[in-house]
Swiss-Prot record:
Composition-biased stretches (Basic and acidic residues): 56-97
Cell compartment(s), UniProt: Cell membrane
Subunit annotation: F-type ATPases have 2 components, F(1) - the catalytic core - and F(0) - the membrane proton channel. F(1) has five subunits: alpha(3), beta(3), gamma(1), delta(1), epsilon(1). F(0) has three main subunits: a(1), b(2) and c(10-14). The alpha and beta chains form an alternating ring which encloses part of the gamma chain. F(1) is attached to F(0) by a central stalk formed by the gamma and epsilon chains, while a peripheral stalk is formed by the delta and b chains.
Name assigned to this protein: ATP synthase subunit b
UniProt lineage: Bacteria, Bacillati, Bacillota, Bacilli, Lactobacillales
Species of provenance: Lactiplantibacillus plantarum (strain ATCC BAA-793 / NCIMB 8826 / WCFS1)
HAMAP family per record: ATP_synth_b_bprime
Gene of this entry: atpF
Gene Ontology molecular function, alphabetical: proton-transporting ATP synthase activity, rotational mechanism; proton-transporting ATPase activity, rotational mechanism
Superkingdom of origin organism: Bacteria
Length: 171
């Protein structure tokens, strides 16, 4: 049977070969027009879409990275501002505390000075009153002594009356 194929192959005619060759070329042309061009166009479109998707993904990744950097910078800036605000508040509080303490010390000093003045005035008034009382008593004693010549008993009576007079005078 194999020998029939080999013998049959040698009996292939030129017309058949030409028909097969033309059929092959026409079939290739039809496949090229109907299938090959649309398939290659579809493959090229798909390759372009994939390339665009990759570019878009890279662009999105870069935008996300830039946005993350901006957020980090903003957060860092916010933290710095918050630290600055806290530091300013501490300074302001410290100044206010110092001012309040200084005012309190000045007020306490003023109260002390006023109290000293009041005490000195009271002391001066008391001294004047004592001097006045001593002068009055001295005048009264001198008047009584001048009116009477005193013996020891008279002196004792005068002293006792004077002491009683002091007790009444102070009450």
């Amino acid at each position: 049977m194999l020998s029939h194929l080999i013998i049959g192959a040698s009996g292939l005619y030129l017309g058949d070969m030409l028909f097969i060759g033309i059929s092959f070329i026409v079939l290739m042309a039809l496949i090229s027009v109907v299938a090959w061009k649309p398939i290659t166009k579809m493959m090229a479109d798909r390759a372009d879409k994939i390339a665009n998707d990759i570019d878009s993904a890279q662009k999105s990744r870069q935008e996300a990275s830039d946005l993350a950097d901006q957020r980090r910078d903003a957060l860092s800036h916010s933290r710095a501002e918050a630290s600055e605000i806290v530091a300013d508040a501490k300074k302001s509080g410290e100044k206010q505390r110092s001012s309040i303490v200084a005012d309190a010390q000045n007020e306490a000093t003023q109260y002390k000075q006023n109290a000293r003045k009041d005490i000195e005035q009271e002391r001066q008034d008391a001294l004047k009153n004592v001097q006045s009382d001593v002068a009055d008593i001295s005048v009264a004693i001198a008047t009584k002594i001048i009116k009477k010549q005193l013996d020891p008993e008279g002196q004792q009576a005068l002293i006792n009356s004077y002491i009683e007079g002091l007790g009444k005078h102070e009450s």
